[in-house]
Amino acid sequence: MQAVRVVEAAGPGKGEPLEREVRALRRAMFDHAILSMNALPDRIFDRAVREGWKRRSYVSLRTVTRVAPLSVPLWAWLAKEDAARFRLEEFLSDVDGLSGALRQYAPGLLGYAVWLLLFASASACWFAVWASLNLLLRARPALTSDVARLFKGLPRPEIFASGVVLAGFAVPVACGVGIAAAAVFWIALSTAYLRRGELVIGGTATLLLFGVFLCGGFLEAIHPMAGSARQGGWLGGEGYYYRDVSDSRDAGRGLLTGPQWERMARFARARAEMQGGNPRAAESLWTGLIEEGGDLADAYNNRGIVRVRLGKVEEGLADFEAAASLRPAGGRAQWNAYQAYLQEFRLEQAARIQPVAWAGIRSLVPFDYRAEEMTHGELIASPLRVGDVWRTLFTVREEGLREARGSAFHDMFFRPVPGGWVPAFLAAGWVWAALWKLLSRKVWMSSVCRSCGAGTLVVGSREATDICNACRAQVGKGIRGGEERERRGLSISLHRRYVRACSILFPGAGALWAGKELRTMLYGILLSLSAGLFTVSWSAGRLAGGLIGDMQTDIWRAALGAVAVLWLFGAAWGWRSFETVQLYHNVAGERL
């Protein structure tokens, strides 16, 4: 009920009533060993949106940081607002709060780890699509010439060859092939006609797709925890208080098997029992955890709180001292021992540890604990540490390949390749590229001049032959007049139009024709990161509400603007780069 009063007291111009309700809620939270009411900021923000004072909600949300210090969305939203208003001091404070919440709130870390993995996967997929299409367009003229050699007995073989090459692009799309599988196929089609720098782009795209495959397995592994963390599931006990969280069936639902996960589930269940007002059940759970061994400082501290609540002050003090000896810089155990000494009127012992206790709780970022205000025997519980969750997640990642075979990413990006064959399929793309690079030194294949578009048959390194002799000699349309000059002029004009069209539709293509492979790859990475950020944030902005939805909406709008700017820059840069190459070889600026 007190949390509801805080939500109702929030509003523009209600600073003093809200402060009063926040202080009352904080006292109630200490009584139940609740560290943070993470649902409060979202409730207040939703109310502000409904009642039309969203833009004036900053003061209210700043006030509730004292009762929702582990709310990562709250700190991130405040940091965004401070950056927009150029409040440097508040911004730095909010960044400290954000980092502190990420370090200490395990469910928050899970959720943001999922978001980062989705962002990385989306960016990698966009890079693979961008790279594969640009490389296919780069190789298309030479590939069409080689396919036309297969139809040399037919009239106008180049028409049939163009249809075959177009089918190589369109058939995977029409058949519903996953975008990752299609990208590998397109890169494989282009491999024989690429320079070394372009092969690096294709190989990087293939490696990133393997990373996407592994990310799918990783997300599949942590989905049972991340999906229930914000709804008050087994890991939600550190930031939310729900009456049914203490149910053992709820605490273990969706949990991965293994001793690490089972211990973490019991830790969260014991914290939920503390919050739910069941000290005897919590004491039993903490005792069981301590008997198992491992990292015991937090368990000792929490059991000490429970025992003090049960009137077992001596036993509680022993637990606090044990926790302080195991983790001297922890802060919580020293403060709790100090409070217990005061309750027992052991003033000498209290005075001895007072400086350490006061300094310790001041350093517990993002918690705004002020010793001079805490005069009612407030005891500070220990949360489930993020380090435990993160280390255990790394253990789960060893099984990521097995999980990836049945993940949603496999069905979405790699169909119809069977899950067990995806690594072999991606490796085959690499082997194919290596074999064609070796065979190209022995097999005569078509090559197209990067400057004028003239085709020829070459064998060996493409770097030495991708500028024709006429362009090296800078003879323009040629020395001879008549039909030969007209044919060369038409070839130059068509090639120029083709590259310019590619530069507009697929930014960066013109720079590839200009021979700027590594700079083009860096540009593609920036474009893909912006597109990936837009993809993930747009989805989250539509589905999520509260502070997260508001921030995601701002992010996808900024990301969309970045994509538009980068697209225009890439088109102009590619156009200009190719124009510079043609000017250098004396084939630009002429009109038919």
What are the language-model segments listed below?
Residues 19-39, 47, 218-310, 315:
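Membrane-interface segments at or immediately adjacent to transmembrane helices
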Residues 39-42, 73, 264, 298, ...:
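Start-of-helix register in tetratricopeptide repeats
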Residues 66-72, 79-105, 324-325, 331, ...:
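TPR/TPR-like (Sel1-like) alpha-helical repeat modules
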Residues 98, 396-451, 467-500, 520-592:
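Transmembrane helix recognition focused on a "late"/terminal membrane span
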Residues 195-202, 208-244, 436-444:
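Hydrophobic alpha-helical transmembrane segments in integral membrane proteins
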